[in-house]
UniProtKB/Swiss-Prot annotation:
Signal sequence residues: 1-19
Protein name: Ig heavy chain V region 23
Organism in which the protein naturally occurs: Mus musculus (Mouse)
Chain spans, region Complementarity-determining-1: 50-54
Region span, Framework-3: 86-117
SUPFAM superfamilies for this protein: Immunoglobulin
Amino acid sequence: MGWSCIILFLVAAANGVHSQVQLQQPGTELVKPGASVKLSCKASGYTFTSYWMHWVKQRPGQGLEWIGNINPGNGGTNYNEKFKSKVTLTVDKSSSTAYTQLSSLTSEDSAVYYCAR
């Protein structure tokens, strides 16, 4: 079996009237099938614990799929049933960062992943 990889593109999106609101993600991740990856989304310019953080997936040529969301204030989560066994959402309040961990990666996980407030 030849070497293969999975490419995950990370994009942040924020809504609101204040231009200083930012969600920052580190960029492209290159991982091997079967591995796990933890994607980060660092928030700034607003009170992190006051807004739910959403994660969305988009495969090439396809529409957006809502993965789930997390309440940074209390850690409460909601998941799309499709992703429940694939994804774990967490936050670190001290660094105002949201995370999504994807496990047992396959070619179907190669996509653009958005975090959105």
